[in-house]
Design a protein with these regions (language model features):
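Regulatory loop-to-helix N-cap segments in sensory/regulatory domains
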Residues: 152-164
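A conserved regulatory-domain signal marking ACT and ACT-like small-molecule sensing domains
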Residues: 1-95
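Short hydrophobic beta-strand micro-motif common in sensory/regulatory domains
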Residues: 133-147
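Positively charged, low-complexity terminal tracts
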Residues: 1, 120-134
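Short amphipathic alpha-helical segments
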Residues: 12, 16, 56, 99-103, ...
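Conserved beta-strand segments of the P-loop GTPase G domain that flank and frequently precede/overlap
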Residues: 119, 151-152
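Signal-transmission/dimerization alpha-helices at domain junctions
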Residues: 165, 169-182
Length: 182
């Protein structure tokens, strides 16, 4: 068996997720975990699955599309994906606070395969608010140390939940910086 991460948008209506999961089950794909990210265009379902060795990325994309999933993204995964998401995020926050990880390292671990760059800028509250925001492929986050962090990822598209998690890590880093300065 092979581990895969699958992300797809499904209409947020009764029964639509079950159609997708049935399509995967027909191919002997076992769903190990699922996260649901609510968006304006539907529910973005993020699965960690175990699939028979012979199934390819294309086979899984086909299964998702036949199950009424849209915008499928499929990538190989490993056992680290089995860690409970809230536990993983709390561990990242602890690393930021105790200094064993930088904010950039924690955000990269949180969001997966992404590029993070930093640009100098003012650090007033209004500039920090102006620096915040996200699109499908990018995020802007105020760096508590000053400037702005730019996060880019071509796929899968960022969700509001991922943006909120990244913002929460920024807030944790702010608290850590205040305590360090004290």
């Amino acid at each position: 068996m092979t581990l895969w991460r699958i992300r797809a948008t499904v209409d947020d209506r009764p029964g639509f997720l079950s159609v997708l999961t049935a399509s995967l089950a027909l191919r002997k794909v076992n769903i190990l975990s699922v996260q649901v990210h609510t968006t304006e265009t539907g529910a973005v379902d993020d699965f960690l699955v175990e699939a028979p060795e012979h199934l390819t990325r294309a086979d899984l994309v086909d299964a998702v599309q036949r199950g009424r999933g849209r915008d499928p993204w499929v990538s190989p995964a490993d056992v680290r994906g089995l860690v409970d998401e809230p536990t993983r995020v709390l561990a990242l926050a602890a690393k930021v606070l105790d200094g064993t990880a930088t904010l950039e390292e924690a955000i990269a671990a949180l969001l997966g395969d992404c590029d993070i760059s930093w640009r100098a800028g003012a650090t007033t509250k209004s500039s920090a608010v102006a620096a915040a925001g996200f699109t499908a492929t990018g995020m802007q986050l105020p760096d508590p140390a000053g400037g702005t962090l730019y996060v880019r990822r071509p796929a899968p598209a960022f969700t509001p939940a991922e943006y909120a998690r990244a913002q929460a890590l920024v807030e944790v880093a702010k608290v850590g910086a205040r305590h360090t300065a004290s």
